[in-house]
Curated annotation (Swiss-Prot):
This is Putative F-box protein R638. Residues 5-52 form the F-box domain.
Length: 134
């Protein structure tokens, strides 16, 4: 009895080429659709931007092109090397805020970096305290 599945008819390289045109979510869903397709999960390159903390436990985490790590979590909440200053009275009308920054680590293996994609990601996950002052 022969299995007429399209995945059995195409070459593995052809399937990987087709997967390169799909969104990352679709790549994962197709790879998890049956046991014979699990091999594509570890051979596919994922193109979206992901937090390192979300993918570090995956066995195929090295297949992600763009990984972002939040370095604000690594800062000691009670640092010993900070100097405290008292602001003069005329500075009390100004809002003082810290914009959360992310270090973007991009694996550069002769690929073109889409800077708009990175800027959209940073804007999506950052808080601007001055946004509501206008």
């Amino acid at each position: 009895m022969t299995d007429n599945n399209i995945m059995n008819l195409l070459n593995e390289d052809c399937i990987l080429h087709i997967l390169s045109f799909l969104a990352d979510k679709d790549k994962i869903q197709l790879s998890l659709s049956c046991k014979s397709n699990l091999k594509f999960l570890h051979k596919t390159i994922y193109d979206d931007i992901y937090f390192y903390s979300k993918i570090k436990h995956l066995s195929y985490y090295h297949r992600f092109k763009y990984v972002v790590q939040d370095t604000m979590d690594d800062i000691d909440p009670q640092p010993s090397n900070i100097k405290w200053y008292i602001l003069p009275a005329h500075y009390t009308n100004y809002a003082i805020g810290i914009r959360r920054q992310y270090n973007v680590y991009i694996k550069m293996d002769d690929t073109i970096v889409d800077e708009n994609k990175i800027e959209k990601f940073i804007d999506k996950y950052t808080y601007d305290p001055y946004k509501y002052l206008d």
